[in-house]
Amino acid sequence: MDNIDSYDNYSEELSSFNPIFRNFTHITSDSENLDSQFIKNSLGVDLDKYTKDSSLLFMIESEYFCDFCNGKPLNLIKYYLLVVLGSSKDVSDPIGYIPYPDKSSIHDCNLYNEFFMKHPHSLLQQDESSCNGDCKLDDLMTLCKWCPICYNKLCNATNLQKILRSAISFTAIPQSSVLYVRRNTKKINYNDINDLELVKKFLNYDKLKIECIKQRIENADNKIKTYVEMITKEKIYNTKILETLLEERGGSLENYNCLITGIDSLLNKNTDN
């Protein structure tokens, strides 16, 4: 069973599961799946324009997770996020679309920096002195560096897409880039070996996460204990200093204050005279 909704409605459980997204599917006009139809119907986007060279739409997929009932895994859950790497600066272009497929520029798009290990703008090598204006495309793609001369010469959607793909990492996913979340729920069949293997994989992963959280709590307790011990030692040290000082000055702070008051009285008396 699939449920599709906005990121906001799934943010709490996504934060709880903290899923790892491993599979990245480029959404193009050739994509034939549930999401393609949903994109057409719900987002009002005609996928025919989204070729492999002009699309900035990606579907990312999580591992399977389990939800529990009475302490026992009940369902297998998987999340799919439709994300957009960026969009054309021209508001008349559809979302997640590289403008001017025949000739486009990085500078024609607003990109989400979080998706890239190195921002594509940085891949444009600014030093033109070492370039003879006749760079080979294969060399450019291997080095991931483009001098402005060659970039302008070879600039088109295909090459721009190659630049983007060379730097993409999905290490961080900005919330505003998530167009929707699809949540797939499947009831666990305990007689199905595939389901059991998925459950075991999740439980092993979940155990590591629980142990990690437990270790963090223990580390916090140890830090608190160490801090309390340090503060206690500091308190004892300063208490001894205070007791030593007051022992020679009347035995208490009250007596010391009386001494100061007496000196003030003598000063006032002598001043009046």
Swiss-Prot record:
InterPro entries: DUF5886. This is Uncharacterized protein L494. It holds the Pfam family DUF5886.
